[in-house]
Amino acid sequence: MEVGFKALLDDLDVLEKSLSDPALINKLRSHVENLATLSKCNPHRRSKVKELSSEVVDSNPYSRLMALQRMGIVDNYERIREFSVAIVGIGGVGSVAAEMLTRCGIGRLLLYDYDTVELANMNRLFFRPDQVGMTKTDAAVQTLAEINPDVVLESFTMNITTVQGFETFTSSLTNKSFCPSKEGGSGVDLVLSCVDNYEARMAVNQACNELRQTWMESGVSEDAVSGHIQLLVPGETACFACAPPLVVASGIDERTLKREGVCAASLPTTMGVVAGLLVQNSLKFLLNFGEVSPYLGYNSLKDFFPTMKMRPNPQCSNVACLERQKEYMLAKPERDAAAKAKMEADASTTIDEGPLHDDNEWNISVVDDENEKDTTKAASSSDTLPEGLTRELPVADEYEKAIAIASGSGETEEEDDLEDLKKQLEALNAA
């Protein structure tokens, strides 16, 4: 297209020289230059893909992802288009997590943030300088739609810690328009918390406890050299209020802790690692492969990845969390019975193993070790030869027997030895 615009401009130059009044030509040239600029600003977008294909061609954006299914890692990767994921906080971690899920072909993304893109955000990933001044949600939708038009994107520019924002947040999570057949009170499959303050985390925690919604929490330290992710299942694992940070437990307003002129450090590397761990565990949770980490830390100074499990606190200050704990304990006998039945079913299932190789070119057979020993013993004890074969020399036993008979010292020598021993014993006793 750029070549065509350049040729058109060249033609206008030639035409300008042949006309006495070049004003009209200059006007046309201005229009062409504007069109050329617009064509550069609006890159080509691919068409939507109706069905995922594993065909390995350059034009298939999902061929590398579908290879996970072909290699046995995932049973059915196409299910990813049925899932909805909500991301709260489109900052250094949340924006990268949103991009990763978009490239993986997630079905629907719900994006929540109230901040705008600034030049100070350019040290991080995802956002571009030409998006400065836009809300982070609008900028994210713009970029993600260009990356993968198959993903349904819904943005909410609001603060979820306000009363109105919290109500909008919970109502959007319960919207099942994307998947009406989804069970439970929530319309999303997973909530990812990528916020940078405890107040917003507590708001997400409250909403997920009320809706019985599984969610994952993530964060990066103020010095930008460590981070963590955590899986939170209401009633089964500790919620964010079960073991709150000191700032939350003491009731201090965290806004008073921020010093004027001092900002937290930010490294795109640390945020990229945390976002990768977050999305990796999200995919394992959604597509049911591997093991989801209940808590995974990251210390970049020592490349240390601590893991742990956090049980719910029976004395948690969150009322909704206590209710979920009671529900989980009441359902425990049913879960144990189901697990026992599954274990028995797996144990009773016998797999008929066929031959490792159908063809046996060299007629190799497997012989039992015990039978092989018996066969060897029987063969060694038998002195019979096949018909038509004779021994040139006698066997060792026959040879020794013949020498003993010839010398006449067979049994006589043994008797003499016994007599000598008897006399020696009598002499010892007499002494």
Curated annotation (Swiss-Prot):
Residues binding ATP, per UniProt: 92, 113, 136, 159, 197
GO molecular function, one term: metal ion binding
Entry keyword annotation includes Nucleotide-binding: yes
Record family assignment: Belongs to the ubiquitin-activating E1 family. UBA5 subfamily.
Protein function: E1-like enzyme which activates UFM1.
Entry keyword Lyase: no
Pfam families reported for this sequence: ThiF (PF00899)
CDD domains on file: ThiF_MoeB_HesA_family
Domain of life, source organism: Eukaryota
Active site: 263
Key words, A-Z: ATP-binding, Metal-binding, Nucleotide-binding, Ubl conjugation pathway, Zinc
Residue ranges, annotated region (Disordered): 339-396
Designated name of the protein: Ubiquitin-like modifier-activating enzyme 5
UniProt organism field: Arabidopsis thaliana
PANTHER family on file: UBIQUITIN-ACTIVATING ENZYME E1, UBIQUITIN-LIKE MODIFIER-ACTIVATING ENZYME 5
